A protein has these predicted regions:
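Conserved catalytic submotifs in the C-terminal HATPase_c
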Residues: 16-20, 38, 43-53
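A residue-level detector for a conserved hydrophobic packing site
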Residues: 61-62
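Short helix-loop "hinge" at the ATP-lid/N-box region of the Bergerat-fold HATPase_c
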Residues: 72-73
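Short beta-strand/loop element within the Bergerat-fold HATPase_c
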Residues: 79-91
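Short alpha-helical Gxxx[C/S/T] motif in the catalytic ATP-binding
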Residues: 128, 133, 137
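Glycine-rich ATP-binding loops of the HATPase_c
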Residues: 145-153
Length: 169
């Protein structure tokens, strides 16, 4: 993970962009992670059926989604729901990973993208988080000049990103 982060931060890697089906990629990832959802007794909500094409590096976007979903699994609480959404809007495809649980404290929201930053160190020790996942997301999304972020809700947190829409008009 650190090697990946260093390569991205120092721009040593050429990012190859391609048209790919984001909906199918997410579906396949979730299928391969199914046992993790079952172990934590998490209700997964993802009901995108049709292809949704985006323009990005598919391998890098798998890393982004893997980090978002892993974070959701590590922090899900309360109703134990993880909901993944895809929306097309204004020439972009926006994907979100929401988990029920405690919102991120406002004073920490701006720092969660920093390398090695951990909001709850005691909780992070429980699952062995290194604090580089979201900084990798930041580096990947910035290398592709795309938007990403986090939204706090009363009942949880949503991490999101946007990619260029490559669906037929």
């Amino acid at each position: 993970n650190l090697l990946t982060l260093n390569e991205l931060e120092f721009g040593n890697e050429v990012v190859t962009m391609e048209r790919f089906d984001l909906a199918s990629m997410i579906h396949n990832m979730l299928r391969s992670m199914q046992v993790l959802f079952e172990q934590k007794d998490v209700k997964l909500v993802y009901d995108v059926q049709e292809p949704v094409y985006a323009w990005a590096n598919e391998f890098k976007m798998e890393q982004v989604l893997n980090n978002y979903i892993s974070n959701a699994l590590n922090h899900v609480d309360g109703e134990k729901i993880i909901k993944i959404t895809i929306q097309r809007q204004d020439g972009h495809v926006r994907a979100g990973v929401f988990n029920t649980g405690k919102p991120i404290p406002e004073e920490d929201v701006g720092r969660i993208w920093d390398k090695f930053y951990k909001v709850d160190k005691a909780r992070t020790r429980e699952y062995g988080g290194s604090g580089v996942g979201l900084s990798i997301v930041k580096a990947i999304m910035e290398s592709m000049h795309q938007q990403y972020g986090v939204i706090n809700y009363d009942n949880g947190v949503e991490f999101w990103f946007e990619l260029d829409d490559k669906n037929e008009a």
